[in-house]
């Protein structure tokens, strides 16, 4: 990356890679997007590249889960909850899908800045 600043999609909470100490902030941000239990594993805390890889896998799994829920919502929820609740559920899943897509991009950008796995 150049001195022009971070690329579009870079997380606001993480300073650009040119900034001193950016990796420390990146590690905290990545941990925030992983299961809390990951904090207890020394390799995850000591190896930012491992953490970034795990965060990518985690976000991808969340995205797949949201897609799976979206595909099943009408069938599974419709008969008992009705069309209004199903529509609200689908809207929530659409919003979550958009959030996760943006998060996936941000995690990938941080991972690329940290270096190859």
Residue ranges and their predicted role:
Residues 17-117:
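Eukaryotic low-complexity, intrinsically disordered regulatory segments enriched in serine, proline
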Residues 6, 10-14:
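Extracellular/periplasmic low-complexity linear segments
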């Amino acid at each position: 990356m150049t001195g022009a600043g971070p690329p579009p999609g870079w997380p606001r909470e993480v300073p650009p890679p040119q900034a001193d100490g950016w990796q420390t902030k990146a590690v905290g941000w990545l941990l925030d997007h992983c299961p809390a239990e990951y904090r207890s594993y020394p390799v995850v805390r000591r190896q930012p590249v491992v953490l970034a890889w795990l965060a990518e896998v985690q976000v991808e799994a969340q995205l797949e889960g949201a897609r799976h829920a979206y595909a099943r919502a009408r069938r599974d929820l419709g008969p008992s909850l009705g069309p209004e609740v199903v529509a609200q559920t689908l809207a929530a899943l659409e919003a979550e899908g958009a959030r996760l897509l943006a998060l996936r991009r941000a995690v990938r950008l941080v991972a690329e800045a940290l270096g190859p796995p």
